[in-house]
A protein has these predicted regions:
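Structural signature of alpha-solenoid helical repeat junctions
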Residues: 34-38, 55
Length: 67
């Protein structure tokens, strides 16, 4: 549910809220690597839209490290 809400907020242009929702989603995604990867991807997109390329790169690295 939080993943979908984050997607909606990102589509609506509210990148900060999208990132917050995705980060909250990570707290419930333990043991679900595909969900974790998707949430980190959303965080990366949100950070890009907020003008934080370094933070976006960090989120992408986190997505690559999910197992």
């Amino acid at each position: 549910v939080l993943y979908r809400l984050a997607e909606v907020r990102l589509a609506q242009g509210d990148a900060a809220q999208a990132e917050q929702l995705a980060r909250r989603g990570l707290t419930y995604a333990s043991g679900r690597p595909s969900l974790q990867t998707g949430l980190w991807g959303l965080i990366a997109q949100a950070r890009e839209r907020q003008g934080d390329p370094a933070g976006a790169a960090e989120a992408r690295q986190q997505a690559l490290g999910v197992r």
